[in-house]
Amino acid sequence: MYIFSYEFRKIGGGSNRNNYQLNSAPAFKSSQNTSTQAKPTFSN
């Protein structure tokens, strides 16, 4: 359980937080990607 919590904090902290949210929540990709990264967004 400690390892899971530690990994979860690593994923949810720092610069990886935006990447984790963008990858796990496609709904926010189009809105956040333009302000956080300069990569093209996917739109279905």
From Swiss-Prot:
<protein>
    <recommendedName>
        <fullName>Uncharacterized protein DDB_G0288887</fullName>
    </recommendedName>
</protein>
<feature type="region of interest" description="Disordered">
    <location>
        <begin position="22"/>
        <end position="44"/>
    </location>
</feature>
